[in-house]
Each structure stands twice: as C-alpha cells, then as structure tokens.
C-alpha cells in the first residue's frame, strides 16, 4: 500500500538571557539589549533592576541656577540660597544664571554679582560706577599718594635747588629730582598724580588699590582712559577722597569738571573658574565699539572683579581675539585648562605662570548650540553633546559614545555627573524629553524617563537637579519627599529575525526578586502590529522563578515588554520557542 508523507515536528529552542546590556534604540539588537526602558538602572549589572526613588526637596519660585559647593547653592525668585537658606544677595534678575565658584565666593552671571559664603556681609556687584560734577584737585605725588613738598615747574633748571627738589621740565615733559650730595638732576622714572575730590567715602567703598578702571572727564587728558589705581583712600574727612594715577600735572591745580570712574566686566557668553581666575568668552556685536567681537578673557589672578588690569605682570588680566568663526557654545575647566567650544572647534588655553597664556585650536566636533550644560567630567574624561552624537574627549579628538541612542536627533542637552555615571536630559525631534544615563564604567546606556532637567549639581553623596516644573530633586532620594509609586518597564527589540520560518512562543520563565506589593505584567507584540497583548501578571515577594505560559501564536517575529511598579531585580528571562515551517 502506498506510503503517506509524514509531518516533521518543529524544532524547540530554549533561550536564556541572564545578562542585560542596557538601552539600544536600534533596529537590530544584541542579546540582552533593550529597545526601550523606563526607570531602570545599571547599578546591579548584569541584572536588570528598577532605579532608586527620587526625593523632591522643594518647589522653587523662578529658579535660575544651581551650583555644587560644600553645600547646595541655587537662585530662586531673585535670591541666592546657600544650603537651602536665603542669603543677603537679593534683587537678581529673572532668567537663567551661571553660578561660578571661586574660592569661598559665588559669582552670579549675567548679573555680575558675588557672595562670600564665609562672610555673609561680603556681597555685592563685581562692577563699580561713580561720577561727580564738582571741584577736582590734581597734585604731583609719590606712589603712596604723598604730595611733593618742593616742586618747581619751569623751562630751565632751578637755581640753587635744595636736596630732594622736584623739577618739571616744561619743554621735555619730564620730572627730575636733585641730589645735593651728587650735585646732579636724576629723572624720575614714574610720576604720579593724586586726584582729590568729594565722594563722601563712596570711592574708597567702591574701588581699591590695584583696580583697573575706565576714567573720563578729568581735566588732564593723560589721566583719562584705562588706568590702574595705585592708591585709593580718604583723608581725615570723607569729603577729601582720592585716587593715585600715573601722570604729570604742573603743580597743585583745581578744576571743575564731571568725572566718572568705572570698573567694568566684559559681556560674556560663558564663564568658568580655572587656576584662581575667572575665564570667559564672547561672540557678538559690541554697540560701544561698533564691531563684532570674538574673544576670550580672564580676570586678574585671584581677583574676579578686575578684567582690565594691565601692568605687564604675570598676575594681570588677559584677553585674546579668536580667528575661528561662529558663536561660542560652551566652556569648562578641563584638567586645569580653560576650554572653550564652538560647534566645530575646541579652543584650549594653556595657562602660563608668566602671564603669556597660549590659545590652541582643534578643528573637530564641538558642543552643540544650546547644549552648553551637557559638558561634564566623569572620572578624567569630558563628555558633551555635539550636533551629531554624545562625545567623550580626553584632549585629542572626540570619540562618539552614543550609538545605542539610535538615529534620533537630540538638542538642548543638560548633563550631570555622579560617580561613574553621566546623566543627560535632552529633547528629541518630536519635542519629547528623555533622561538618559551612561554608565561609563560598564559602557551601558539606560533611559530613565521623560524628566526635563534644567540643571544638575552634585553635592556630597547626592545628585541634585532642578526640573522644568521648578522642583528641586535629589536624584538618589537621600532627602526630600520620595516618589509615591515607581513605575518601570523594559521593551525588547524585534526577536527571532534570525529564524526565517514561522515560530511559536509557548512560555516564559522569569527569575526575579520583588519587594512587597510590587507587580509586573508581561505584554507581547506579534509581527509589528503595534498592539501589545496582555500575556500575564506577576505579583510576588522575594526571589524566585515565575513561569508565564503564553498562548501559542504563529508569527514571523515578535517583541516583549515587561512593565510594573515597585522595586524589582530581574536575574534572567528564559523563552521556549518552537520553530515551524515557512508556510
């Protein structure tokens, strides 16, 4: 009798995943990678686990900046707060701030204000501006402001001069001093003028010896312009305040004029601290100079108030023009070097002990415009968001580290560093926000949630942030009001594309640990239909293996999602699969 054809049984496979390799938003994933995650962490790698709950410390009013010092510092509603307490520095303008730490001081930009965290009475403006319309007296003096008592002004040498007589040669505009022991006149190398006026003590309160200032309105033209104050003070009465400048006047004279003294800071796009100076950069049109400027600056050594102190000393302030075109996009102190970024440049300054600082240029991926706050040092590596990817930089050329984020376009990145982790909040092309975490030690990315972070700051054993809802949050939950419920999820990529035949998924074995009242649900999607099918629920406490039977369904490919609440650790996921024919 004829033999009938026999049907061959399908091949059954058991696939176990016990190493979870983080987030990878790509079409093809390696074993253990996840296409999407919510509120998971790499802390327990190779396990998959939910992150710690965050703690909300406060809801702020008009927050404007965040700074990491010994205590958390921030601006809210126009006031600087240190360790959650308001300081005397109030009246700050609305909007985003750059808070820069220099020693015990906090410098606030663009307001150009400062506050001393060790002396609460020491605060105010970095700039100073004073003017007077009235009588001003000019007197030749020494560097200490002591007037010359025997000063002769003439076109020829005085007859029978006494020892120590000063003579202003009107023809040559030089000052000579007579020595009776040598019988000769010797030129005085530097001549000073004491400028005395009535300021009611305002000038000594606003300015100090060593300030670099802009002076206008003095009757002696040589005393106007950018000047160095060799002395500032007041006589026995506050109506007789004075400054000491380099310059020559023909004896003690008094004029009536309108005088103005200004100590000014340049307008700067970004400001950082490095090697006991503040450094800044500026690109844009200067309405005073009527030209576009493209410059970097630094303050005088140890003096954040002085940016126009030019005495030929190693401690002077400094400025340099830059040839590369385009706006500045960020700045950071990287390994003791002031480092400034454009979208296609990295400019690094080598600080010199002699004051001859050197500006170097590297043509490469720089910081994306709007992502200045993505700059973070983790370990000794600098991370930042470029126009195309997330970069790691160690002084040579940047290396991309964000292939796992897929081909999405992100902007407005804000970064934070905690331990070996790089936190990065940024917006995608659909205007949705994402908080990613890159574990630099393990080389793994994870996506936490949609938190829109305005600024990060690490203080002690906590990473703080201010979000778009003005909440001051402890990311590791060490303080504040903890989240009531932590929802988490993981989603695989497309599974079993390597098998061309149709297949059946019959069961899942999931080994996990769950805290009390934690739950988890399993969902399946078949053949990219876009719909998730509820395939089982897990509700248990402690560690154990849960078997989830799946109703067999023939498909070409599939995806799986696990979503739940509460603290969970997943040790492994085993899948039983039967591969059939291609029909």
Residue positions per predicted region:
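Beta-sheet repeat architectures centered on beta-propellers
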Residues: 2-71, 366-370, 377-381, 388-583
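Small/polar beta-strand repeat architecture
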Residues: 9, 126, 132, 143-144, ...
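Beta-strand-rich domains and repeat architectures in extracellular enzymes and scaffolds
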Residues: 51-76, 265-273, 325-329
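Short hydrophobic/aromatic-rich beta-strand motifs
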Residues: 72-73, 104-108, 158-177, 210-215, ...
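Structural motif
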Residues: 78-81, 114-120, 286-302, 344-350, ...
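Short, surface-exposed terminal/edge motifs of secreted or surface/virion proteins that either
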Residues: 79-84, 112-128, 165-189, 228, ...
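Extracellular/surface-exposed low-complexity repeats and stalk/linker segments enriched in Gly/Pro
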Residues: 88-95, 140-166, 190-193, 405-414
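Beta-propeller and closely related beta-pinwheel folds
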Residues: 264-416
């Amino acid at each position: 009798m004829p033999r009938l054809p026999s049907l061959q049984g399908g091949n059954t496979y058991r696939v176990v995943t016990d190493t979870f390799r983080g987030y990878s938003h790509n079409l093809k994933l390696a074993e253990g990678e996840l296409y999407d995650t919510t509120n998971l962490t790499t802390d327990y790698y190779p396990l998959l686990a939910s992150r710690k709950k965050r703690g909300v410390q406060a809801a702020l009013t008009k927050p404007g900046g965040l700074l990491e010092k010994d205590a958390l510092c921030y601006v809210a509603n126009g006031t600087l707060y240190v360790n959650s307490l308001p300081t005397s520095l109030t009246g700050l303008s609305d909007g985003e701030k750059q808070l820069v730490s220099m020693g015990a001081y906090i410098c606030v930009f663009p307001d150009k204000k400062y506050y001393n965290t060790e002396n609460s009475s020491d605060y105010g403006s970095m700039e100073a501006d004073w003017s007077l319309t009235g009588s001003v007296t000019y007197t030749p003096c020494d560097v200490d402001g002591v007037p010359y008592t025997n000063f002769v002004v003439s076109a020829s040498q005085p007859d029978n001069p006494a020892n120590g007589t000063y003579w202003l040669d009107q023809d040559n505009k030089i000052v000579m001093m007579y020595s009776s022991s040598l019988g000769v006149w010797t030129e005085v190398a530097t001549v000073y003028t004491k400028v005395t006026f009535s300021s009611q003590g305002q000038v000594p309160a606003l300015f100090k010896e060593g300030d670099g200032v802009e002076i206008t309105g003095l009757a002696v033209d040589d005393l106007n312009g950018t000047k160095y104050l060799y002395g500032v003070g007041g006589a026995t009465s506050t109506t007789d305040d004075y400054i000491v400048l380099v310059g020559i006047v023909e004896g003690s004279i008094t004029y009536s004029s309108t005088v103005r003294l200004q100590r000014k800071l340049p307008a700067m796009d970004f400001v950082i601290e490095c090697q006991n100076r503040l450094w800044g950069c500026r690109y844009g049109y200067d309405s005073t100079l009527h030209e576009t400027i493209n410059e970097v600056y630094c303050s005088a050594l140890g003096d954040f108030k002085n940016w126009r102190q030019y005495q030929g000393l190693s401690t002077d302030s400094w400025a340099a023009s830059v040839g590369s075109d385009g706006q500045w996009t960020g700045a950071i102190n990287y390994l003791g070097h002031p480092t400034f970024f454009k979208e296609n440049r990295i400019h690094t300054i080598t600080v010199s002990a002699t004051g001859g600082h050197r500006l170097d240029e590297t043509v490469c991926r720089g910081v994306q415009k709007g992502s200045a706050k993505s700059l973070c040092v983790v370990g000794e590596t600098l991370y930042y968001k470029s126009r195309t990817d997330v970069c790691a930089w160690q002084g040579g050329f940047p290396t991309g580290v964000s292939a796992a984020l897929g081909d999405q376009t992100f902007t407005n990145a804000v970064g934070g560093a905690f331990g070996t982790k790089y936190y990065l909040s940024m917006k995608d092309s659909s205007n949705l926000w994402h908080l990613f975490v890159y574990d630099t030690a393990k080389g793994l990315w994870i996506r936490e949630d949609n938190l829109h972070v305005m600024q990060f700051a690490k203080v002690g054993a906590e990473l703080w942030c201010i979000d778009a809802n003005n909440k001051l949050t402890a990311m590791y939950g060490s303080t504040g009001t903890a989240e009531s419920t932590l929802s988490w999820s993981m989603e695989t990529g497309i599974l079993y594309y390597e098998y061309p035949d149709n297949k059946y998924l019959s069961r899942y074995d999931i080994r996990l640990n769950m805290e009390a009242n934690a739950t988890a649900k399993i969902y399946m999607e078949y053949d990219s239909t876009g719909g998730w099918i509820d395939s089982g629920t897990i509700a248990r406490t402690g560690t154990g293996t849960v078997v989830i039977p799946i109703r067999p369904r023939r498909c070409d490919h599939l995806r799986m999602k696990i979503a739940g609440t509460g603290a969970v650790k997943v040790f492994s996921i085993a899948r039983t699969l039967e591969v059939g024919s291609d029909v």
